[in-house]
């Protein structure tokens, strides 16, 4: 999904279908020069619309945390932003592999 303003790409979202019921909005990117146009909000809305049209029940809009070393801290403003779309917070384990 790409967002345009005056024929210029100003944002995009990448969705992956993860199973028959859900997909994940894996990346929701914007060009910060155009942040006042709220393309991130539009991209979430369009992703929700697309998921519903394709028979999916859930759209995972990703994690909402900051990392300070090994410490994980909730990113309150991002959580609030996502809750405006009706999102419900869930805790999920994150696995990492040290190479």
Residue ranges and their predicted role:
Residues 35-51:
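Conserved acetyl-CoA-binding loop-helix of GNAT-fold acetyltransferases
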Residues 30-38, 67-73:
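Short, contiguous acidic/charged loop-to-helix segments that flank catalytic cores in large enzymes
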Residues 54-99:
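Active-site/acyl-donor-binding loops of N-acyltransferases
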Residues 13-14, 48, 79:
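Generic hydrophobic alpha-helical scaffold/packing signal
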Residues 21-25, 42, 55-59:
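Short amphipathic alpha-helical segments, especially helix-boundary/capping motifs
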Residues 1-35, 97:
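A conserved beta-strand-loop-helix scaffold within acyl/acetyltransferase catalytic domains
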